[in-house]
Amino acid sequence: MSKDHAKNNYRDSLFRKYFEHPDKLAALHELLTGIPTAEQNVEIKTLKSVLFNRLKNDISFKVGDRFIVLFEHQSTINPNMPARMLLYSAMLYRKMLSKESIYSKKLIPLPAPEFYVLYNGKDPWKDNSKLYLSSAFAENQHNLELVVTVRNIRYNKDNELLQKYKPLHDYSFFVYDVEKRVASGDSLADAIRSATDYCINHNIMRDYLLVNYEEVFEMMSLRWNEKDAKKYWQK
């Protein structure tokens, strides 16, 4: 695993662990789309196949038979995300379709895809911006398009998206608090412990952190080299 991949992976892991539950995903989908989403209609479909190696999907889920939703959590700007989403969605649809059904004379209904990047990095990235698969094509004329919507979940007090959904706010604040403490000179271990204790005491991710205290510490500390962490967060 490269250093860049390792230093970003802790957030992806924590994001997946914290949000990959039907109640949170239903609320997050409703927040992003404005479409009422019932928890009981959410069916988690996250790709975990070794076939994709590092290209494992962060979170994907069906909403009844209407939508198939793919979330990727990113802390670096990645213009290749539409191509990755294309691979992920193809794999998900392949799992839904039998070999016999795709040769049937009857039209097979498919859930409509929705693609989101939840961006939590330090570099500026405009909220609600779009990434297009066609941007990578060598020719302007094409018959295939895929659009990824980027939502900026980087913590700041004025981020309206975070104000609308507490779990998203809490997650973003927790990551921000660890970063701030490391940038101020704390060791990575001390920063994680202090941020965790602070959040528990201030009802930020409280229930999750109480139950998963040591797991969160390991996810965030074992994937970082201390020197790399300080260099990155002090930029």
Predicted regions and their residues:
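Accessory alpha/beta interaction modules
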Residues: 1-166, 235
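Coupling/switch segment of ABC-type P-loop NTPase heads
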Residues: 153-157, 162-186
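Short, charged alpha-helical interaction segments and adjacent helix-coil junctions
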Residues: 2-5, 62-75, 101, 151, ...
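Intrinsic disorder/low-complexity signature
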Residues: 55, 167, 174, 222-225
